[in-house]
Regions:
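Conserved beta-strand/short-helix segments
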Residues: 1-279
């Protein structure tokens, strides 16, 4: 569990082991990892996966506020002992420049179909608060770059859309390979857009060449503010769910897109739409 505002936004992450008895207090967690310094917001995002291909599940943590919001991502290997501070992480990856918010979002999945789980990090403020946004893919190839600019793949947003604010991975075309989904909730006057990048051997480097683009219903909806994936109709295939927190004066909406061979390009034609209770 992340607590990014702990101790003047230094941030903390808490691990609770599934040992038959979960503690009711964060202070009694099995492992507590502290951020590096105030303002880092360590714990702003979390993901898990086997990031060094040793058969054990590791932890990735974002700290979007690190160094004037340049941002950092940390990987902690499951090697028998977790450090007490982020500064002692096994891998540290630093964003490109101030106010990029690198580490605001993290997801994981095998994005080059080599059988190993890769790390994906979003920086919705890139470049330096202009907020076009970028998404960085780091392949699990035995050596992670320490700088975001040296990622294996970089996908760039446009038009101050805050691309990379939310990320999720899942097989959304039922071909047996994990695909990448990223949002730009501020697109087109905060209407919002969600982009699907299929794992077909070549991931594009700009949102303009995404395999599927889904656009929100109207301005100021923030479509894509949140993303998740799962089998929501029990057909054995992974579907996509998208949140739009500001729909109808912050009433909010959630949209489900079934993995049925054709994902629509507009939120209004989602397979399921769930509307919040009140403004």
């Amino acid at each position: 569990v992340g607590a990014q505002d702990y101790a003047s936004t230094t941030g903390r992450v808490y691990l609770f082991y599934n040992d038959g008895s979960l503690t009711p207090s964060a202070a009694s967690a099995d492992v507590i990892i502290m951020g590096e310094t105030t303002g880092n917001s360590f714990g702003s995002s979390l993901a898990s996966g086997d990031f060094n291909a040793d058969g054990r599940i590791d932890l990735a943590v974002g700290a979007l506020g690190y160094s004037s919001s340049t941002g950092r991502a940390y990987i902690f290997y499951q090697d028998g002992s977790y450090p007490a501070t982020a500064a002692s992480a096994d891998i540290t990856i630093t964003g490109e420049t101030t106010i990029d918010f690198f580490g605001a979002s993290i997801t994981s999945g095998d994005l080059n179909a080599d059988g190993k789980v890769d790390v994906v990090v979003g920086a919705f403020g890139w470049p330096s608060s202009a907020s076009d946004g970028q998404v960085y893919i780091f392949y699990n190839d035995g050596s992670y770059a320490s700088a975001a600019a040296s990622a294996d793949v970089i996908i760039t947003g446009s038009g101050a859309q805050s691309f990379g604010f939310s990320l999720v991975a899942g097989d959304l075309n039922a071909d047996g390979r994990v695909d990448l989904i990223a949002s730009g909730y501020a697109s087109s006057g905060n209407t919002g857009k969600v982009y699907l990048f299929y794992n077909d051997g070549s991931i594009p480097t700009t949102v303009a060449t995404a395999d599927v683009t889904i656009t929100g219903e109207t301005t100021s909806n923030h479509f894509g503010y949140s993303l998740t994936a799962g089998d929501f109709n029990a057909d054995g295939k992974i579907d996509l769910a998208v949140g739009a927190q500001r729909y109808s004066t912050y009433t909010g909406r959630a949209y489900i897109f079934y993995n049925d061979g054709s994902i629509p390009t507009t939120a209004a034609t989602a397979d399921v739409i769930i509307t919040g209770e009140t403004t």
